[in-house]
Amino acid sequence: PNNSEKIYTYGVPILSSDDGGQTFYRIGKENVHADHHDLWINPEKPGHLINGNDGGVNITYDDGENWIKNNSTEVGQFYAINVDYQKPYNVYGGLQDNGVWMGPHNSVENKRWNMTGQYPWKGILGGDGMEIQIDNRNPNIVFTGSQFGFYARLDLDSGKRKSIKPSHELGQSPFRFNWQTPILLSPHNQDVLYLGSNFLHKSINQGDDWENISEDLTKGGKKGNVPYGTITTISESPITEGVIYVGSDDGIIHVTKNGGKTWKNIS
């Protein structure tokens, strides 16, 4: 505010100019989230900035050379959570624009975490963290992903990652995936994985191969930035294998009682 040549602009990423906007340079660092929404500039102290972003709040006193991450502000938005069967069990969560994290359920917040580096939570995927399914036979095998159906099978032990997003066949219309695409491991067989687009897809080998086991279970898509006419939830009966309920964002609920051979609209 006291220097007409000094300009800040933010969105993705955060930039600064010292020459009235003729040239810009990045001032974000590795501990600052890439998506920026607000910036406070101290009128009494040049270089003192407070930045609000998708990761929370960051503060700098030297015009972006170094940033402090303020972890005390609890602003994380979870899209989904799940747990495994370990003892003690782990909690998994997909966060809006902050990836997928996991950690022991019995961890207690400790102010020494930052000093010791012994933070109990671990990030296992980036992007917008979405739903999580864990193989109950081997908790190192985790299925999770980011927005619009970009899911992967993770081996937490080896660090290997395999993309498992279903693809349409040549000549077919592309599938429509919800922002928060649903996935489900069958409670009857942990090799069987379901994933919803506008169709219900089934894999019998943990996502290596897919088959469509339904027709389009929506009223059809609409043009726009975000897909519409998509499946949003999948549930299989824990008692009877092959009894599956599917809901979509246009208000339709379908059920199959024979593993996808026939479907009935019950909405």
Task: Specify the residue positions occupied by each region the protein language model found.
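Beta-propeller blade termini and top-face loops
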Residues: 1-267
